[in-house]
UniProtKB/Swiss-Prot annotation:
It comes from Rickettsia canadensis (strain McKiel). This is Large ribosomal subunit protein uL16. InterPro entries: Ribosomal_uL16, Ribosomal_uL16_bact-type, Ribosomal_uL16_CS, Ribosomal_uL16_dom, Ribosomal_uL16_sf. One of its GO terms (cellular component) is cytosolic large ribosomal subunit. It holds the Pfam family Ribosomal_L16. The gene is rplP. GO terms for biological process: translation. GO terms for molecular function: rRNA binding; structural constituent of ribosome; tRNA binding. Part of the 50S ribosomal subunit.
């Protein structure tokens, strides 16, 4: 699963995504992409599940790019622990996805296969998405 090699800080604030994405809003590598419509927190496990679903649908043909990286540590308290006594320990990593952000890109496969693969990947993600294509 995706996780940063080094971190500057062990724990992070919860945070919110309040504005639209400023960078990563256009296709950079592939001819088809999966663009977010909502703002939400996507975990490393959800990204990996989307990647597996898309590559399985593509039958290992073509190329898939993941344009988001989980760099925010999410902490959690253990079960049946009272409130207070500090913040919980980091459990997993996530990325805050803003509306308009390209999350996955595909190239090297037919259009119907690429669209089907991106639809499968979008079912694994907690954000509403739209499939975009490159027009030359």
């Amino acid at each position: 699963m995706l996780a940063p090699k080094k971190q500057r800080f062990r724990k992070a604030h919860k945070g919110r995504v309040v504005s639209k994405a400023k960078a990563g809003t256009t296709l950079a590598f592939g001819s088809f992409g999966l663009k977010s419509i909502d703002s939400w927190r996507v975990t490393a496990r959800q990204i990996e599940a989307g990647r597996k679903a898309a590559t399985r649908c593509m039958k290992r043909q073509g190329r898939l790019w993941i344009r988001i990286f989980p760099d925010v540590p999410v902490s959690k308290k253990p079960a049946e622990v009272r409130m207070g006594k500090g913040k919980g320990s980091p459990e997993f990593f996530a990325v805050r996805v803003a509306p308009g952000r390209i999350m996955f890109e595909i190239a090297g496969v037919e259009e119907n296969i690429a669209i089907r693969a991106l639809e499968l990947a979008s079912t694994k993600l907690p954000v509403r998405t739209r499939i975009v294509r490159r027009y030359e």
